[in-house]
Structure formats: structure tokens, C-alpha cells
């Protein structure tokens, strides 16, 4: 294999690797966006849950009716 052919082969490999790296980077960026949205949704669900627990916890503190 001549030196020129080896250089062409290496340049071709580098081009494919660059494309692969860019595709992987794009995927990581998209996954980061998804994770961020999921974190916001989980935080909202936790907030709702705590509000619901607070509403129901207050009802259990009332004294029983006099006939008990």
C-alpha cells in the first residue's frame, strides 16, 4: 500500500469518525433536554403530592365527635 493510499484511508476513517462523533453529540444533547424536562415534571409531581398529603393530613388532627 502506497503512502498516498494510506493517507486517503486515514482521511476517510477520520471523516467517518467525525460524523459518528457529531451524531453521538447530537444524541447526548437531545437526551439532556429530555432529562431536564423529566426532572421538571418530577419536581411538579412531588409538589402536587406534598400538597395533597398536606390537605389530607390536616383532617386527621381534628378531635373525634363527642359521642365517641
Swiss-Prot record:
InterPro entries, A to Z: SlyX
Pfam families: SlyX (PF04102)
Gene3D superfamilies the UniProt entry points to: 1.20.5.300
Domain of life: Bacteria
Disulfide bonds: none
Family per record: Belongs to the SlyX family.
Full protein name: Protein SlyX homolog
Amino acid at each position: 500500500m502506497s503512502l498516498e493510499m494510506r493517507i486517503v484511508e486515514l482521511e476517510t476513517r477520520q471523516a467517518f469518525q467525525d460524523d459518528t462523533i457529531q451524531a453521538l453529540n447530537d444524541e447526548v444533547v437531545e437526551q439532556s433536554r429530555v432529562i431536564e424536562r423529566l426532572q421538571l415534571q418530577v419536581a411538579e409531581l412531588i409538589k402536587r403530592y406534598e400538597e395533597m398529603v398536606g390537605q389530607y393530613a390536616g383532617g386527621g388532627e381534628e378531635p373525634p365527635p363527642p359521642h365517641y
